[in-house]
Amino acid sequence: MDALQDEDVPYGNDWDSLAEAAAYGEAADRARPWRAEIRDHIAARVATLGSGKRVLELGSGPGLLAHRVLQRCSNLKTYTLVDFSEPMLALSRQRLAVFPTASYVLTSFKSDDWTDRVGGLFDCVVSMQAVHELRHKRHAAQLYEQVYRVLAVPGLLLVCDHTPFDDSPRSSALYMTEQEQQQALTGADFTDVHVELATNGLVLYSGKRAA
């Protein structure tokens, strides 16, 4: 068995580099322009929750999803961005400077204590192409259990990530199939788990904390 099937996959980017983080932010939508459709869908779903809600984003990157949600949902109580990369958070602060409800937490959602650092319960947790940054899909079950605990009741999770690009050990270790994602979510006690949108290998899943 290939070691990549058992071990965490090394990072391919230096996320401590502001230049590299900025280059990613500029190129992301050029490489996958259909990402905008998913951001729009997430923003629309958050808008249905009503005013005064608290939203947490895991793996916020350069703030593209946060910007779309905050544009659409001006009545949120708070929007908390979590990322382990200070350069990514710096880019987010610049992009979101006009949104006073945005706050920023430098931590890895792979750590055991990130749930303590984000501060309280949230009505909605969102994530856009970040779960694979766990660097191995075996960590996803624990992550979703942690997410479940930081959700209020009722609470909504909207998580988008790529399916495997091919059958290589690297891709199979990093990315989950639709079935694997839904199994991990239901295993963490989320209900009404289903695919909300799928396009060009990107899949948006939702799940609820109802009790």
Each predicted region: which residue ranges?
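C-terminal alpha-helical "lid/dimerization" subdomain adjacent to the S-adenosyl-L-methionine
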Residues: 156-205
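A short SAM/SAH-binding and catalytic strip from SAM-dependent methyltransferases
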Residues: 124-138
